[in-house]
Amino acid sequence: MDETTREMFSPHNLPLEMMEEILLRLPVKSLTRFKCVCSSWRSLISETLFALKHALILETSKATTSTKSPYGVITTSRYHLKSCCIHSLYNASTVYVSEHDGELLGRDYYQVVGTCHGLVCFHVDYDKSLYLWNPTIKLQQRLSSSDLETSDDECVVTYGFGYDESEDDYKVVALLQQRHQVKIETKIYSTRQKLWRSNTSFPSGVVVADKSRSGIYINGTLNWAATSSSSSWTIISYDMSRDEFKELPGPVCCGRGCFTMTLGDLRGCLSMVCYCKGANADVWVMKEFGEVYSWSKLLSIPGLTDFVRPLWISDGLVVLLEFRSGLALYNCSNGRFHYPVSNSISGCRDAKVYLKTMVSPNDL
């Protein structure tokens, strides 16, 4: 490259709009280095709006399992919080696992509420608090001391975490239910307003099926598997912009022959695993959220003796599955399992996929 060309493409001569479009498509590691190029780059990359735009663009690459994949998996057990890259689970002979216990002050009981734009929301048992944490840039923020729970073990709280685009606000949704009662009370926490408020739109007669499972964030909504008095299985969906709950029907398979189901997120689509007695575990995806006709069966997994939840699917239809005892890969082409994916993350109690971004919990 001659001197004239080099001068033309120097940071000082690029239009700001062009420079931003280029930087928005780079991984976090590169952006961190490029902060040192010049003051204008550092200022741009440090902006809160830039971090959000960057996260939204990265979400479009969700299907890839290449080394450029911006996604990772966070796993929890009773005493440990670990993470690894999606691409290493699929492609590496040795999976590099990061341990994050020291970053989180050694807290001993984690429940991951959900992930959104690279932020991991988790609940800590010992102080009944909610935290936001970005494992990529290693920053965390305490949201609130959750007054939702008391020493009364009869109250069960189920959480969800997502982003309300209409208000530019990250929110935590809590569903509170007294044991042996059907009625559910709902509370919404706003990170912008720093307070909890009540919501009264939860449908009557609906019960969350698995209270240990957090809501699945899809397209501005949070979703839980549920049962209702009118049907065997249903989905309860909270629209964050409209601030309302409603029921969504599952695929046609989810009748009374289906004894349980789990929800997930596959390639940005709501997914559902249906277990029917004497049959396979069927994995469905809702290709257009909210449209019942768009449910499509993606695959069937035979011979399962444990409940699973798909976390990821590659272009080659190799599925990353979360079992109760760890993670496994299932190849749809030959029907083979690879288990465990890594001994370092075997025995995990919960697993969530997260995006590697620069969104800071301290800027909310």
From Swiss-Prot:
Span of domain F-box: 8-54
Keywords for this protein: Kelch repeat, Repeat
Pfam families the record matches: F-box (PF00646), FBA_3 (PF08268)
Ranges for the Kelch repeats: 169-215, 216-265
Gene3D superfamilies tied to this protein: 1.20.1280.50
One cellular-component annotation, GO: nucleus
PANTHER family assigned to the protein according to its UniProt record, in alphabetical order: BNACNNG10540D PROTEIN, F-BOX PROTEIN CPR30-LIKE
Protein name: F-box/kelch-repeat protein At3g23880
